[in-house]
């Protein structure tokens, strides 16, 4: 089977790696173009780009697939199927119709729940008890195509964005191979659009004094490692935390261990990181902190 693989971030790496070890032929890899990053702002290739080059596979980095020249190039690879995993570009109808078996997508949620760009974060923010992977046929809608295979698992108490991301990436690659091995036997299941909800891209990682305690706790998990508080205009990331039901004045840091009183409970930071410093336990952090800072309110 001739496969075009379309993906960019680390989530897609497991699937590409498994395909490269399979009997199928990956004839091309489509990924986002290198973009500047780091202090030197040097162009950095996506994780998928790096693996493809190491495997001597042609890499394509178009800025859009809406142009006829790009569509003709895609067609010339003569793909039987295109596999999409967090690619980052919209696939127009002309592209969707080229492969014999169409374009199939690895989506890290139990569709139709959490269609969109940030399903893992929204799964945690909503307090969902389970999650999973949906292998779906791409159409012109937003994650609205028929489902070819779906598998779920329970979310554990200690799971955060990273642990769920890694579990879903592994499950997605395994499910993908099952679908491809039985591609002509698939019985597509139509999604119920009435049950759909959407996972918009997350851009605000701040924990606010007005947040409920459980919401703040979920933010720590969902936005790992980016959730933060601000004290005296200093940004402090909270990488791990717990919470308890006791609470006092909302937004107040209530003791020398930096427990944060919020609506409905107290957030208890366990691992934190000040800007420009390495992560550390809350105990080590407090020892190196001005005592005045731990008697403030978060902003």
From Swiss-Prot:
Gene that produces this protein: fmt
UniProt family annotation: Belongs to the Fmt family.
Binding site for (6S)-5,6,7,8-tetrahydrofolate: 109-112
Catalytic activity as recorded in UniProt: L-methionyl-tRNA(fMet) + (6R)-10-formyltetrahydrofolate = N-formyl-L-methionyl-tRNA(fMet) + (6S)-5,6,7,8-tetrahydrofolate + H(+)
Taxonomic classification: Bacteria, Pseudomonadati, Pseudomonadota, Alphaproteobacteria, Rickettsiales
This protein's GO CC annotations: cytosol
EC assignment: 2.1.2.9
Spans through the membrane: none
Enzyme class (EC, first level): transferase
Single GO term (MF): methionyl-tRNA formyltransferase activity
Name of this protein: Methionyl-tRNA formyltransferase
Function statement: Attaches a formyl group to the free amino group of methionyl-tRNA(fMet). The formyl group appears to play a dual role in the initiator identity of N-formylmethionyl-tRNA by promoting its recognition by IF2 and preventing the misappropriation of this tRNA by the elongation apparatus.
Organism listed in the record: Wolbachia pipientis wMel
Pfam families: Formyl_trans_C, Formyl_trans_N
Alphabetic keyword roster: Protein biosynthesis, Transferase
